[in-house]
Regions:
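PRPP-dependent phosphoribosyltransferase catalytic core
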Residues: 92-138
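Short glycine-rich phosphate-binding loop at a beta-alpha junction
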Residues: 24-35, 111
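Short histidine-centered catalytic/ligand-binding loop motif
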Residues: 3, 76-79
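Short, glycine/charge-rich flexible loops or terminal/linker lids adjacent to PRPP-binding catalytic cores
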Residues: 37-76, 83-92
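Short loop or secondary-structure boundary microenvironments that flank
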Residues: 33, 81, 136-138
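Short Gly/Pro-enriched loop/turn and capping motifs at secondary-structure junctions
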Residues: 59, 81-84, 114-119
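Conserved acidic residues
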Residues: 27, 73-75, 107-109
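Active-site-facing substrate-recognition patch
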Residues: 1-23, 72
Length: 138
């Protein structure tokens, strides 16, 4: 994760190159927590797209919004890693609940992780623990 802080321009170029190489059509990055809040505005501006940050439940805020930012039509989940899938599930649920509430539609088009190297995970190929059950999966 240090790449965000040491070389954010390098991270941006790696994300751009990876998504271009994979022919991913996207218009939004969505992440969660402080690291997303720090990098997504810069990343999205550089790649000419929208961004949104989903608040973690434990984060106190003056805002009643679970999501800050804008979600377009084709969004990419952006996080340092996917281990159990808890954050991935939570972000997906928040995005779709928010869109449903606003009577909008958007498609999830994959995930980008950046902890060791920038990696694109196409839909259904995310390294999510199959044993992990999120509260809305039942």
């Amino acid at each position: 994760m240090k790449e965000i802080f040491v070389d954010p321009d390098g991270l941006i170029e790696n994300v751009r190159s990876t998504l271009s190489h994979e022919n991913v059509e996207y218009d939004t990055f969505v992440g969660s927590g402080l690291s997303a809040a720090l990098i997504l505005p810069r990343l999205a501006t550089a790649l000419d797209c929208a961004w949104a940050v989903v608040r973690k439940k434990s984060e106190g805020s003056h805002s009643c919004n679970e999501i800050e930012g804008t979600i377009g039509e084709r969004w990419v989940f952006f996080d340092d890693l996917i281990e159990t899938g808890e954050t991935w599930h939570r972000v997906q649920k928040a995005v779709y609940d928010n869109l449903r509430h606003q009577r909008l539609r958007a498609s999830y088009v994959g995930a980008v992780t950046y902890s060791w190297e920038v990696t694109y995970w196409s839909v259904g190929r995310e390294p999510v623990d199959p044993e992990f059950k999120f509260e809305y999966d039942e």
